[in-house]
Regions:
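C-terminal "cap" of GNAT-fold acetyltransferases
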Residues: 117-131, 136-165
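Extreme N-terminal starter segment of soluble prokaryotic enzymes
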Residues: 1-4
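Short loop or secondary-structure boundary microenvironments that flank
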Residues: 8-9, 123
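Charged, amphipathic alpha-helical coiled-coil/dimerization segments
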Residues: 96-97, 102, 108, 112-113, ...
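Acetyl-CoA-dependent GNAT
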Residues: 9-93, 104-106, 110, 141-145, ...
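Active-site acidic-Proline motif in GNAT/NAT acetyltransferases
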Residues: 91-93, 97, 125-126
Length: 165
């Protein structure tokens, strides 16, 4: 059984464990590096700040074992009716069990509860499993995100309307 629940700043050790696992397992999928969150970067205040500065953070558990994570951020400035799906990761042992689907659905529900019109995300072009996951949930590729020349770092922007389904 998959359970997805919000994570609050006092649970920073859980978020830390999952985030470090994610950065070690899939460094190509994130904007930060494992080394940036280790050593001097591995401080309680920093983990708490990460959880406080992003509007929504959640973990997925399979039979009580942490299996994945995701965040949701409010759009701002030019996109106040948009939310953004960030930092989705599923532990290798939990892939193919619906954990990614549950995490995406949780962010979509969170965004709808905040009266957002769309949810957007950025995904590395080479991350085919993630792109397939997002397409299953109605996300559409709207083009390149940024001007990165290096093929392994190129990202695509995907958007999902919350009014289409």
């Amino acid at each position: 059984m998959i359970r997805v629940r919000a994570v609050l700043p006092p649970e920073w050790p859980l978020w830390r464990t999952l985030r470090l696992q994610a950065l070690a397992d899939a460094p190509y999928a994130f904007g930060s590096r494992l080394s940036e969150w280790q050593g001097d970067g591995d401080a309680e205040w920093r983990w708490r700040d990460r959880l406080q500065s992003v509007a929504f953070n959640a973990v997925a558990e399979v039979r009580g074992t942490p299996a994945g994570m995701v965040s949701g951020a409010d759009g701002g400035g030019e996109a106040p009716k948009e939310a953004e799906l960030l930092s989705l990761w599923v532990a290798p042992w939990a892939r193919g069990r619906g954990v990614g689907d549950a995490l995406v659905e949780t962010v979509l529900a969170w965004a709808a509860s905040r009266a957002r019109d769309t949810v957007s995300l950025s995904v590395r072009e080479q991350n085919r499993p993630a792109i397939a996951l997002y397409r299953r949930h109605g996300f559409v590729d709207v083009g390149p995100d940024g001007g990165e020349e290096s093929p392994e770092l190129r990202e695509r922007r995907m958007v999902r309307s919350l009014h289409d389904r």
